[in-house]
Amino acid sequence: MFRKKKKKRPEISAPQNFQHRVHTSFDPKEGKFVGLPPQWQNILDTLRRPKPVVDPSRITRVQLQPMKTVVRGSAMPVDGYISGLLNDIQKLSVISSNTLRGRSPTSRRRAQSLGLLGDEHWATDPDMYLQSPQSERTDPHGLYLSCNGGTPAGHKQMPWPEPQSPRVLPNGLAAKAQSLGPAEFQGASQRCLQLGACLQSSPPGASPPTGTNRHGMKAAKHGSEEARPQSCLVGSATGRPGGEGSPSPKTRESSLKRRLFRSMFLSTAATAPPSSSKPGPPPQSKPNSSFRPPQKDNPPSLVAKAQSLPSDQPVGTFSPLTTSDTSSPQKSLRTAPATGQLPGRSSPAGSPRTWHAQISTSNLYLPQDPTVAKGALAGEDTGVVTHEQFKAALRMVVDQGDPRLLLDSYVKIGEGSTGIVCLAREKHSGRQVAVKMMDLRKQQRRELLFNEVVIMRDYQHFNVVEMYKSYLVGEELWVLMEFLQGGALTDIVSQVRLNEEQIATVCEAVLQALAYLHAQGVIHRDIKSDSILLTLDGRVKLSDFGFCAQISKDVPKRKSLVGTPYWMAPEVISRSLYATEVDIWSLGIMVIEMVDGEPPYFSDSPVQAMKRLRDSPPPKLKNSHKVSPVLRDFLERMLVRDPQERATAQELLDHPFLLQTGLPECLVPLIQLYRKQTSTC
C-alpha cells in the first residue's frame, strides 16, 4: 500500500549515424598492432628506432638552479646545508658522481666507462687530448692535473683543492696576461691580478665578491713535454698526495664554497696568443710521478681564428668553436670548393652570416680576431649563456609573428630526439604543413637548433625538404615544413624488400641532394632511412638537418661525435678529423638497410655496434647472394674504411648501378602497400 515507487530507468538509444572507420587488431604472427591511426603508429615506430647521439663533452651547459636541501639515506644535515652536504661527500666517489663538479667528466673518461674507446688511442691520437676543456684534462694514467703547472691529484681527492702557495697565482697570471698579443686583451694583466688577489684575500668559507672580472685564462696542451699553463679559473692550488688524510671539515667547507663560486661565476675563459708550435701527444708520466713542465713557448691562441667556423655549426651560426673540431689545414676537401654561402647568393637579412660576430649563444666564444694567424686552435667557451640571451640570438634568424594565428587542426604524427612533429593546416590556404616543435630548454645542444633554420632556409634543392617559415613561440622553436604524405623510408624498408630499380631510384635522389650540399660545404651527419621522406607520387627528399655541420677553407674538417650509432662512419666513432665522406658511409649503411631490412649489428647495443664499426672490416650484406655484382660494387665504393679512398657523391652518380634508376612512380607501389598494411587488418 505504501510501497516506494520505482524510478523509471532512462532509456539510452543506440548511437546514431555511427560509422566504424578504424578497426585495430593485434597480429600475433608479426607481434604488432595493425590498423592503428597514423599518429599512433608513428609514435610506436619512433620509440623503436635508435636515437641520434651528440658528443657528451659538448652538451649545453645551463644556469644553476637554486640549491635545495638534499637528504641521502639516513644522513641528516649537520650545521646547515653545506655541512650536511660535506658529510655526504665522504660516502660518494668522485668518479661515480658528478653532482658537485663544476664541469662534467671528460668525454674520454665517459667513453672509457662505456667501453667506447681503448687506451691505445690516447697515445696515438694527440688531437683527442685537445677535445676536452683544459681544467678537465688528465695524464695518460687518468690523473687530474691541478692548475699549478701540472701536479697530479688522484681521483680520490676533492677537485679544486685548497691553495697552498698564495704568491704563485698573481705572478703566473701577470706573466701570462703580459704575454697576450691581440689588442682586445690589453689590460688582461690587471684583471687577472685583481682576480687572483680577490681569491686569496677571501677568508675561509667566504665567497669572492661578484664584481670580480669573470674572465679566466685557459690554454691548450702544446708539445710532448710542454707546460700546462696556469688557469685563472681554478687557481694555482697544489694537489695533496693521495695518501694524506682527509682535510678538516672547516677546510672542506671552504673548498666547497670556492668551487661553487667558481662554477657559477668564473666559468668563462680568456685566450692566449697564437703560436706556431705543433700540438703533441700528452706526456707519458707514471701514476705517482710528479709532473714538472719546463717553461717554453707560449701556448696557442684559444681565440677563434679570423673567419673560422664553429665546431659543429654552419658558417656564421651562433655556435662554439671547440678543440674537438680543430682543423688540419694540410688536409683539403676532395669535393668542390666549400664556401660559406651559395655562389651568387647574398646573405639574407638577419641571417647568421650577418650577425655571427655580434650575437652570443650557448658555448659561444669571443669575436674572431682577423689578425690571428690561420691554423690557430679554437678555444673554450666564454661562459654559460643565459636562456634569455639564447632566445634573443635565435630571434634574429627566425621569422616574426605567431604561427598559432595562422594554423589549426594540430595532430601529432611523430617524435624525434629534439622535439615533436605535428600535422597542421594553414587557415588561409587549407594546405597541410608539418610543424616541428622543439623546446629550447630540453636540448642537449641548443646551438644545433640554428641548423634547423639556417641550412634548410639557405640551401634549397629538389631533393631536400622545403622549409616554409620558422618562429619562436614561447620557449619553443617552430619550423614549418612541407608535409610528405608518403612517410619515411624506414616504414617501407622495415616491411617490404626493395628491388634494385627501387634501391637505385632512392640512392640517386639522395646522392643528388648530397652532391649539392657537399658542394656548399654542408655535412648532414645523420643519413639513414629515418631521414629520407617520400611523397605519394614517389619523390624522395632528404630531411632532418638538426645535426649537420658546415665546413670551409678555414675549417675543412670536423671532429665531434655526432650521428646515430649504427650508421656512423668509423672516423666519426674514433674521433678522427672528417668531412663530407661520412655521409657516403652512412648512405652505404642505408643501402644495406634497404636490402636486409635493418642496418648491420642492429641486434647489438649501440656501444657494441660502434665498437664493431670502428674496429672491424666494413660490414657485408646478409643476403649478398640476392643482389647483382654491380650493386655489390656500388656498396663497396661507399663502405671503405679510408675516407680518402671512399667515393664522393658526384663519383657515385656516375656509377653503372644508377643506370637502373627508374621514375619516381616505381616507388608508389611500396608506399601504397605500406599504407594498406597499416590501415587494415
Curated annotation (Swiss-Prot):
One Gene Ontology biological process: intracellular signal transduction
Domain Protein kinase: 407-658
One cellular-component annotation, GO: cell junction
Chain spans, region Linker: 26-406
Sequence positions that bind ATP: I413, G414, E415, G416, S417, T418, G419, I420, V421, K436
Superkingdom of origin: Eukaryota
Keyword ATP-binding: yes
Keywords assigned by UniProt, alphabetized: ATP-binding, Cytoplasm, Kinase, Nucleotide-binding, Nucleus, Phosphoprotein, Serine/threonine-protein kinase, Transferase
Biased composition (Low complexity): 201-212, 268-278
Tissue/organ expression: Selectively expressed in brain and testis, with lower levels in multiple tissues including prostate and breast.
Regions of compositional bias (Polar residues) in chain numbering: 308-333
Phosphoserine sites (modified residues): S560
Start and end residues of each stretch annotated as Disordered: 1-30, 149-169, 200-256, 268-355
Gene3D superfamilies assigned to the protein according to its UniProt record, in alphabetical order: CRIB domain, Phosphorylase Kinase, domain 1, Transferase(Phosphotransferase) domain 1
Main location: cytoplasm
Effect of L514R: In a lung small cell carcinoma sample; somatic mutation
Function: Serine/threonine protein kinase that plays a role in the regulation of gene transcription. The kinase activity is induced by various effectors including AR or MAP2K6/MAPKK6. Phosphorylates the DNA-binding domain of androgen receptor/AR and thereby inhibits AR-mediated transcription. Also inhibits ESR1-mediated transcription. May play a role in cytoskeleton regulation by interacting with IQGAP1. May protect cells from apoptosis through phosphorylation of BAD.
Subunit structure: Interacts tightly with GTP-bound but not GDP-bound CDC42/p21 and RAC1. Interacts with the androgen receptor AR and the estrogen receptor ESR1. Interacts with IQGAP1 and PPM1B.
Family of this protein: Belongs to the protein kinase superfamily. STE Ser/Thr protein kinase family. STE20 subfamily.
Name of the protein described by the UniProt record: Serine/threonine-protein kinase PAK 6
Organism annotation: Homo sapiens (Human)
Gene for this chain: PAK6
